[in-house]
Amino acid sequence: TNAGIGAKNMAAYTGYTCSAVNMIKKINLALGNVSNLDDGVAAFKAINEENLRALAIFQRYCRNVAIMIINIQTIINASKFVIGGGISAQLVLIEEINNQLHKILENNPMIGKQMIAPPVVAAKYGNDANLYGALYALLLELKEKKQTKMD
């Protein structure tokens, strides 16, 4: 089991293996871009140019995300999974997660027969979704305060 190893081995956690930040760092490290490990533009440029080192890391990352989706799907049976944040603007990401998800189901007939692959899509508002959520929360709070004053 993974019990107790987390502090010593973060790779035991889905939050680590499915971290876009870690994936980008690994790609930049593999490319020798050590001066800016957080350079997402450089990482996705290498992916889109089909750099073999970058692709291997990227495909493993997408496979890990697909596995996480399968695990969640077996519990909640979602109609779709939505990827948000800045990384959701990368169409290659959404395509590869869907690709890895279908590969897993094809290569594991037992799983494939028991579940239908939910579509994985990019969030409508992408990296701005958190801003819309914050604005909505503020508007609700202001409405509540206004209502309280009127009562």
What are the residue ranges of the model-derived segments?
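ATP-binding/phosphotransfer module of carbohydrate and carboxylate kinases, centering on a glycine-rich
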Residues: G4-D151
